[in-house]
From Swiss-Prot:
Gene Ontology biological process terms from the UniProt entry: L-leucine biosynthetic process
Organism of provenance: Synechococcus sp. (strain WH7803)
Cellular compartments annotated: Cytoplasm
Protein name: 2-isopropylmalate synthase
Function: Catalyzes the condensation of the acetyl group of acetyl-CoA with 3-methyl-2-oxobutanoate (2-ketoisovalerate) to form 3-carboxy-3-hydroxy-4-methylpentanoate (2-isopropylmalate).
Major location category of this protein: cytoplasm
GO molecular function, one term: acetyl-CoA C-acetyltransferase activity
Length: 540
């Protein structure tokens, strides 16, 4: 049987696979903020990125290893294709972390071997032990993944896994890369590996999966029943295409249904010992942080963290909940950290109160960033009576969004009405602090603003999404705008919040433009789609 650590290890890949969501690119400070919150959440492993992809990715993984990795903290992991260049870059990036891991992979399905790698099974069987052994010579903790395991021939899969373990892999990850399998099939796949790989007792079995058919969480729970003890997941389930298995859903399923899962761990059914090391009261805070920084809105009916997850509209349900919450709620909202504000903030609140509340929300700002955030807070407090946590999150997420921005929005003015041609004038500051102004007309005030900004920036792009939502309730609520721009097949997101939605739209557009410029200057490799160095030689 596979090695059993006695509980489920949570491997968070929000910063790697989650960031591969279209338009969800994060800068260094945003990645660091999320990594710090993941450590507070109590995940076992943080996959901080793909270091070989670009200098920016390398630096982000290295900074996270330096500032988040610790003797008592999470393992800091980097992804590497099965090639020496990738693996060496990964080892160098995670080196500052006392607890570090290299996660290397190669495809094992015939369709990937034929059309992507152009390798035979024999060639892959030669590459795997060589590259795993090389990784093991650089770090003590190596994870190996069989990409597209769900569509791989079982006998070949068993042989690859056995070779990887013999070469030094201590974790074997089984990905359902395209979200194709059903729970019964995935459970049988894990059980087959557990039964047919002779040295599987030397490694922890891990699973990774995508939600293309909406089955990722169900597949993972079935895998746990069949011996998987590490789950690779993301906050809010973000990720490529339909996303990854959602961390919050997996953790809470194991928490709420502990009596059901305990026997699969050799425990008494009523054992109170948690099945994961996650601090569930940090879940809501982490979800909001990731949503704010990526600009990816959580759907209202999303399990555990959606706005409606604990809302009751039916009169019968409301009556039952008022009498006893257990009548219609299987999860106490407080268990996932959904509580009322403990500090009421307003125009008379001081810097210390704001800093304390931001720290509770998971933001550890530098002195300079705190000064800027406090100035924004005071400005908002002059227009809004009560400042909520969501308002603070909106302020700070915008603050950390563009630390090295090419453009800064200085002024936006619009003129519009039922009998007026919508006109906008905008002023930008460039990197040298020089002001540039432009005016434009459009079909509406936001269109006019975007046209003026495009004229100033001169960066070709296509606006593919504009959305606005209320951050909180009330007529004085802030409006949060998300904008996505597309260029050369890539999406770049920007978001901003203001009590004036036109101003918020202008700032969001500028933030998206800055990401577009940064992305053009620092292109990155995709770990699965881009050609790998091993295509040239199996010994690289």
């Amino acid at each position: 049987m596979a090695h059993d650590p006695g509980r489920v290890l949570i491997f968070d890949t929000t910063l790697r696979d989650g960031e591969q969501s279209p338009g969800a690119s994060l800068n260094l400070e945003e990645k660091l903020a999320i990594a710090q919150q993941l450590a507070r959440l109590g995940v076992d492993v943080i996959e901080a990125g793909f270091p070989f992809a670009s200098p920016g990715d390398f630096n982000a993984v290295q900074r996270i290893a330096q500032q988040v990795g610790g003797e008592q903290g999470p393992i800091i992991c980097g992804l590497a294709r099965a090639s020496r260049g990738d693996i060496k870059a990964c080892a160098d990036a995670v080196a500052p972390a006392p607890r570090r891991r290299i996660h290397t992979f190669i495809a094992t399905s015939d369709i990937h071997l034929e059309h992507k790698l152009r390798k035979s099974r024999q060639e892959v069987l030669a590459i795997v032990p060589e590259m795993v052994a090389y990784a093991r010579s650089l770090v003590d903790d190596v994870e190996f993944s069989c990409e597209d395991a769900g569509r791989s021939d079982p006998e070949f899969l068993y042989a690859v896994i056995e070779a990887a373990i013999n070469a030094g892999a201590s974790t074997i990850n089984i990905p359902d890369t395209v979200g194709y399998t059903t729970p019964a099939e995935f459970g049988a796949l894990i059980a087959g590996i557990d039964q047919h790989v002779p040295n599987i007792s030397e490694a922890v079995l891990s699973v990774h999966g995508h939600n293309d058919l909406g089955l990722a969480v169900a597949n993972f729970l079935e895998a746990v029943k069949n011996g998987a003890r590490q789950l690779e997941c993301t906050i809010n389930g973000i990720g490529e295409r339909a996303g990854n298995a959602a961390l919050e859903e997996l953790v809470m399923a194991l928490h709420v249904r502990r009596r059901y899962f305990n026997p699969f761990f050799g425990r008494a059914e009523d054992s109170p010992t948690p099945l994961t090391g996650v601090r569930t009261e940090e879940i809501t805070k982490t979800s909001r942080l990731v949503s704010n920084l990526t600009g990816m809105v959580v759907q209202p009916n999303k399990a555990i963290v959606g706005a409606n997850a604990f809302a009751h509209e039916s009169g019968i349900h409301q009556d039952g909940v008022l009498k006893n919450r257990l009548t219609y709620e299987i999860v106490d909202a407080r268990t996932v950290g959904l509580t009322d504000n403990r500090i009421s903030l307003g125009k008379l609140s001081g810097r210390s109160a704001v800093r304390a509340r931001l720290e509770e929300l998971g933001y550890d700002l530098s002195r300079e960033d705190l000064d800027d955030a406090f100035a924004r807070f005071k400005e908002l407090a002059d227009r809004k009576r009560d400042i909520t946590d969501r308002d603070l999150e909106a302020i700070v997420s915008e603050q950390v969004q563009q630390p090295d921005a090419r453009y800064q929005l200085k002024l936006v003015q619009v003129s519009c009405g039922s009998s007026l041609q919508p006109t906008a004038t905008v002023t930008l500051l460039d990197e040298e602090g020089q002001e540039q102004s432009e005016a434009a007309i459009g079909t509406g005030p936001v269109d006019a603003v975007c046209r003026a900004l495009n004229a100033l920036a001169g960066e070709p792009n296509e606006l593919v999404e504009f959305s606005v939502k209320s951050v909180t309730e009330g007529i004085d609520a802030m409006g949060e705008v998300t904008i996505r721009l597309r260029r050369d097949g890539q999406l770049f997101s920007g978001h901003a919040a203001d009590t004036d939605v036109v101003v918020a739209a202008a700032q969001a557009f500028v933030n998206a433009l800055n990401r577009l410029v940064a992305g053009s200057l620092n292109p990155t490799l995709h770990p699965q789609r881009d050609a790998t160095p091993l295509d040239a030689s199996p010994t690289l």
